Amino acid sequence: MRRSEVLADESITCLQKALTHLREIWELIGIPEEQRLQRTEVVKKHIKDLLDRMIAEEESLRERLLKSISICQKELSTLCSELQVKPFQEEKDTTILQLEKDLRTQVELMRKQKKERKQELKLLQEQEQELRDILCMPPCDVDSTSVPTLEELKLFRQRVATLRETKESRREEFVNIKKQIILCMEELEHSPDTSFERDVVCEDESAFCLSLENIATLQKLLKQLEMKKSQNEAECEGLRTQIRELWDRLQIPEEEREPVEAIMTGSKTKIRNALKLEVDRLEELKMQNIKQVIEKIRVELAQFWDQCFYSQEQRQAFAPYYSEDYTENLLHLHDAEIVRLRNYYDVHKELFQGVQKWEESWKLFLEFERKASDPGRFTNRGGNLLKEEKERAKLQKTLPKLEEELKARIEQWEQEHSTAFVVNGQKFMEYVTEQWELHRLEKERAKQERQLKNKKQTEAEMLYGSTPRTPSKRPGQTPKKSGKMNTTTMSSATPNSSIRPVFGGSVYRSPMSRLPPSGSKSVVTSLCSGKKTPRAAQLRANKENLDLNGSILSGGYPGSTPLQHNCSIKSVASTYSEFSRELSKASRSDATSRILNSTNIQS
């Protein structure tokens, strides 16, 4: 049983006790029955009125709760629709009081969310409007009466963040451009003369409208100032170049140049004006010394002609170069020509430098070719032969590669400019081919001259006998060394010893290596001793005919056999080659005209 029911039973019991007590009092007093009935009616009426009032109050409470539930349900439905959230789900089997409490709590929560969203929307709108005012952007139409959704608030926050980033980037760009504009104006000595320039330079940075149009105008203004500054710098640099050229042409001494050095840097207006005054002064001085100036220009013209590989016809095409009528008009013609040539060289500088590199490599190649045909190169003592051979091999690889690179670059240039690139009056590759052909013809001519010379020499030897050929003078011997040499060389004849023939002249044996007799140990001892004999010095010189990998260079003699301790007897390569050639020619001649006298010296 509920406690309320127990209390109700107790109330009934209490009422019964009270009525019983009243009847007892009335009985003791002696109140008649009619008055007792009246008094009981009064008690009943009081109790009934009290209970009726209590019931009415409770009924009113129930009505209020039901009304509140209805109101909360309607408001909650509206709030869910505005906030775009799911409708509130009421719990089943709940009392009116609990339902009203739940609905009222949910309504308060929804109201709070609505208020927060509208407050955030208002704050974001204010921030956006402020940023749009700074960026000079039109306002964004947003219904401030409606409740924004969470997604709308998220997009709004992102939009405001984007505007803030745009503002910061434009502000930074504006500050940087402003600094550059101020520097350019100071360099140009230019004061702001328009309202926009004054807004940029003089007004507060925060008051400047950071619109795209203003930023574009700023960039345009900066470009104009930079272009003007570049023009001033180029003009000043041109004036300085002109001054230096005039100094050199007029041979102005250093003590006169020093006062002008102060204006040789910078591009401000006062410096530019000072440079113009100096140029005017030098031009006037140039007209007073026109002949010397023209001669100086002609020297420069000749240098540019050489650098541009002008042919003789191209040089002669500039007729004023050969005129001796030194007038102002002639000077102007020379000035115009030197400017044209300088520009022409600057435009094609890379190609001309490449051709110059090829020319230098070609001259070096011809020098190596000349040295290769010189027999005296084998007598060097500094190891230059090996170094030259390495450089020559390297040059033989790099020269064709350089020609191919230049050919590709020149072909590309000719396609771009629709004209031929000429060197000394002809196309570069034709020029290269001509140089190679001239080199081949020169080698052929030298070969024919050698053959003719050898033929004449052979005929002379057939008639008069051979003459000794000594490619290099043997160094003198000291008395001490000559004594030792006599003890060895006189005991046995060396293969290279010369013998006087019967008919006059000298006849040489074939150079070869011969081991000494087993009993002649003194030969090996003298050749391989620690002391440097002239013969040993010649042996060391002949070792330079060998390459690092053991191969024989041109003119070398591969047939020698090394003795003990690498001591060998070699003849000079050019002497042996001439000897073998003469011997082979003599063997084919008539027997009567090729008698070779020989005398054997017994050891």
From Swiss-Prot:
Biased composition (Basic and acidic residues): 447-459
One matching Pfam family: MAP65_ASE1
Keyword Manganese in annotation: no
GO molecular function, one term: microtubule binding
Gene Ontology CC terms, in alphabetical order: contractile ring; cytoplasm; microtubule; midbody; nucleus; spindle; spindle pole
Region Disordered, annotated ranges: 447-502, 583-603
UniProt region (Unstructured, Arg/Lys rich), positions on chain: 467-603
Site (Tubulin binding) residue list: R377, K387
GO biological process: cell division; microtubule bundle formation; positive regulation of cell population proliferation; regulation of cytokinesis
Keyword annotations: Cell cycle, Cell division, Coiled coil, Cytoplasm, Cytoskeleton, Microtubule, Nucleus, Oncogene, Phosphoprotein
Superkingdom of source: Eukaryota
Subunit structure of this chain's protein: Homodimer. Interacts with the C-terminal Rho-GAP domain and the basic region of RACGAP1. The interaction with RACGAP1 inhibits its GAP activity towards CDC42 in vitro, which may be required for maintaining normal spindle morphology. Interacts (via N-terminus) with the C-terminus of CENPE (via C-terminus); the interaction occurs during late mitosis. Interacts (via N-terminus) with KIF4A (via C-terminus); the interaction is required for the progression of mitosis. Interacts (via N-terminus) with KIF23 (via C-terminus); the interaction occurs during late mitosis. Interacts with KIF14 and KIF20A.
Purpose of the protein: Key regulator of cytokinesis that cross-links antiparrallel microtubules at an average distance of 35 nM. Essential for controlling the spatiotemporal formation of the midzone and successful cytokinesis. Required for KIF14 localization to the central spindle and midbody. Required to recruit PLK1 to the spindle. Stimulates PLK1 phosphorylation of RACGAP1 to allow recruitment of ECT2 to the central spindle. Acts as an oncogene for promoting bladder cancer cells proliferation, apoptosis inhibition and carcinogenic progression.
Similarity comment: family membership: Belongs to the MAP65/ASE1 family.
Protein name: Protein regulator of cytokinesis 1
Organism name: Mus musculus (Mouse)
